Amino acid sequence: MFTLSLLSRGHGKLGQDKQKLEVYFEPEDYLNWRSPEDYVPVSKPQDKNNASQHSWSLFLPKTFSTRKGALILYSEGFAISAWTPKERRKGPYCPRGPWRKLDLELHTLQDLKEAILAYGRQQGEQDRAWQPYLHFRSQLESQAQRQIQPGHSAKRYLRGLLRTWPPDAMYRLWCAGYIKDSVLLQDSQLNVPKKLRPQQDLSGVPPKYHLLPVFPSFWIQQGKSFEQRQQGLDEGEAGAAGHVDQGPLAKNHGSQGTRLPPRRKQPWQEDETQAEDTSIENHLCLYASKESYNEKTQQTSRKAFGHGRIDHSWLPSDKSHITFCGGAFPNRKADLSDKQRNVKLHKARSSHLLQVLPAERSLFPPVASATGSRIITPGEVKKKKAPKALKLPPISEEPPRVLEPLKSQFKANEPPTELFILPVEIHYHTKQPPKEKAHRRGAPHPESEPESSEESTPVWRPPLKHASLETPWELTVHLPVDASRDTLSPQGSSSLPPASLGNLTLKGSKARHTRVHSQGKGVWKGDDDAPPHDVAPPLDLLPPIKGKKSPESQKGVDSPRTSDHNSPPSLPNMRVPRRALPAAQEDSSDPTLGHFLLGPDGEKVCLSLPGHTQTEALPSGKAYESVNSNISHEEEGPSSQHFLKANTEPRANLHMNLYETSPLTQTTEKQGAQQSLEAAAQKTGEPQSCINKALICSNRKEFYTRKLHIDMTPFLKESGNALDYQEEAGRPLRETHHNDQDPEPRSMTLDSPRASRTEHIQTPEADIVQKVGRDYDVHHLHRGLLGYGPESPERLSAVYTSLLPREREGKAEPRLFSQETSANISHERDLINEAKRKEKPKKDKTKGPKSEREGKVYGQAEAAIGKSKDSKAKKKLEKKTRPQRKRTQKERNLEIAAELSGPDVSYEETEDTSNRGSFASDSFVEDPWLSPKYDAQESQVSLDGRSSPSQIATVTGNMESKEERRCEDPSKALLTKREQEKASWDRLRAERAEMRWLEVEKKRREQEEQRQLQQEQLERAKKMEEELELEQQRRTEEIRLRKQRLQEEQQRQEEEERKQQLRLKAAQERARQQQEEFRRKLRELQRKKQQEEAERAEAEKQRQEELEMQLEEEQKHLMEMAEEERLEYQRRKQEAEEKARLEAEERRQKEEEAARLALEEATKQAQEQARYWIFGQQLP
């Protein structure tokens, strides 16, 4: 009996390719293998009603080998077809006893291996020969009746796995480019109806195919029952398909096989009629309805499983613990031993076909019920009386997870916790209109709810569409083409600012505006301020983001609105008044707070301010500029118009009326002022762009400010003194204006050119003093014209109507002007002191290059008003800011006041004009927002605006002189007043001269200190040079000494090495000499020994010859002698021989002793020579 595998029965030999081990059998092996005892002996049943009494003996080999190296339980090479005995083929047989529950249960692959190796140890009949497993009686019957699968086919497994896909899966893969081989699409058979798909013979060699089933079945029937099985399958799917009839009819007819439940529809296939029923036949789970099988087959199978230690849990069932491939399904309960319990279980399972089985956590899909699952009617039972063989259960289908569209991981009604929106333009093609709030703020944040339906979700999404953003709207994402323009998209779409402007973070459904920091510093050149479309605008002042309007402001707002924001490069340094913000926002650390303001029409505005200018103090400390919410710069072409029609039409009409009144006066004065400014610029050496630079305001309230001031000059000329009475009332307003923080951030008040806000920031005290009242009247008129807030048209009309009567009253009030001059002078002194106090903190904010330019401007302004050459030369050397700015302030204040003195009005006006022109350029140099890097083209936009103050000064001065000439009979009091004024002016000039002298002395001291400092620096530099030279010499000496030491050390080492080499050579020479002496002695010893041996041989030869002669003589003598004499002679002979032997022995011992001593001496000499040699080798 063999207990080993196929390889152990024969002998293996390597094939010709040296890679395959082939087994060769001898005739004895074939005889033992195919002997009649090898067949399975089946004993007849003792009791027909008890199938457990059938017994058979089975001796399986403990290991099974194949050429592929796989271990399989059954080998097709040993199987013989038709295992049913012929005498038991008449009718079906149904066992009536309970199944025997075996104690062996296989749960893992390790259990299977142990069961295979332990199989056959306990066997009832040991006397029989070895019987291979499942040899069939008749080999010549139909080969289609083979019952054993030769192993596991990976191709079939893959084919069944791919058949679980939807019918259009292969087409989708092909369209996506994942399948490029057209052969795969030809034989895929996914779109072929299941009735037409061929069934495979699993017992034979698998044909060549591309797509494979999941599990091949153990038993397959072919032949005439194929159509019946297909018909039964269709009937089982079309019928009730939910109940099992395992009653007496089924028992009487021997319904022992298992039926498979019809395929249930999964939710992912309910809407696809072509994808239905895709796996039940693909898994090759066929119904056993073949009538050719009879009761013999059943009896044989029952006999085989009666005593064979094969648990029915090993066979495929709904509670099977193993698959055909050897894998196990976890969390499976132990199977039921009672058949009726199994039937009840299958009834319970098959009655709920619409329930989805829970997915087992295993490598393979879960196994569904495998026992009878369709209604067996009496008609069908009559047709199908043959027993059914066991088949593999189907695989309960799950929705395919490979090509399943990506679903959102959020819950159904839960918005995302945080959503990052890229700055792109997103158009929502909505089924319902989105919220207005999201579109008005420019930050779309729809509540994203993931869709559970897979119909609206594409399988393959474009890269720009985010799978996690599944919203009720269809998203169309467009990258922004023009980064400088953000147009408000129509309804159903919304726009985001460009990526350079920042980002918006949506938390839940509420938008949070983060601060936008500007990084661009670009400069645009040209007359028009519109930036090029391919360049992002420099974010000096970012446009506001419109918010939702308040309820009270939505009632009558019909003005056109646009979000096209083009930020001009020359914007002033705007500040948002902190008073306009709530207290909670003012102290908050949230960067988003402080951006939301209330507009003039109740609209919430989100301002994006550059840098940290919200909390930064202005240089003047007091002047803040309020910003309008609707900043709209529609600058197209060279027009440079900054206004909105809805709020500026009344003012535009006023400007046109004023402009039409006096065109000639405006033209002449405009030219004169421009020439005076150009002259001042040439004197100061400043670039023309610094003087001509105009502040282009980003406020809709300011329109044609340069021309507006020029057009108002006729009214100022004629009204002159008529407007002077407003001075005292206007000055408190002027002072409060400096300390004011506008509570409504709606209008941006700019003092019109010459009294502009930039000059307020740089020199507030000078702006208060200049012209003492006239310029303030102009400024006040402009404040009235420009207005604050929505009520500005009414105030504008009021001021306009009040101008004409005051023109007529101007001639009758010449005294009021002179009466106020003394109060003005005292007030100017207070302002001078205040300017001194304010000048100290300003000095720290100025920079070196700016102060140098300031010094040049100041010195050249002095030269323009008649300064001495010495003072002019000294002023050119000034580099400090504080004294120069003090003197400039005082000079301007005093010269402005000097205009009131009467006869000197033209000179003082010229001086004041030139001084102010130079100082205007100085203020522009100091202004951080207006640097000289802007070109002349841009600066000439506001040329007329900068030249208008000089026009006003000249016109008002001429007006005063005319009034004085008309009034030739002034009163005594007026003359006294003028004398007093002259005296005061003399005192002021003396004070100014004293201040100049002090400044000159201070400059001289500063120059002396600077000279001393330079001398000290030169001495320090010389000393440092000397120290460096000494240090360099010391380092050179150290390097030289280090090199010398290194050379000496190297020479010493070389000398030592040379001496060591000499010693080594001497030792080697001694060793050589000793060796030669030793060899010589050895040669002498050898020669002596040879001589001695030769002498010894010669002596021995002679002795032999002598012995022979003596023997001959003795023989002769003995023959002659008597007996007694002969005996005596022999005795003496023996004694002589003994004596000679002893002498020879003694002589030999002496020679050996001498040879030993000589050898010892030679050995000692050799050892000494070897010692010298080793010592010589050890030396370096």
UniProtKB/Swiss-Prot annotation:
InterPro entries linked: DUF4670
Pfam family, one: DUF4670
Domain of life the protein comes from: Eukaryota
Chain coiled-coil ranges: 988-1171
Comp. bias (Basic residues): 431-443, 509-518, 872-889
Disulfide cross-links: none
Compositionally biased region (Acidic residues): 269-279
Signal peptide: none
Keywords noted in UniProt: Coiled coil
Record flagged with keyword Nucleotide-binding: no
Sequence ranges of Polar residues compositional bias: 486-497, 937-959
UniProt feature, compositional bias: Basic and acidic residues: 730-745, 826-837, 846-856, 960-986, 1045-1106, 1127-1152
Region (Disordered): 229-280, 431-465, 484-575, 730-758, 810-986, 1045-1109, 1125-1152
Protein name (database record): Uncharacterized protein KIAA2012
Gene that this polypeptide is encoded by: KIAA2012
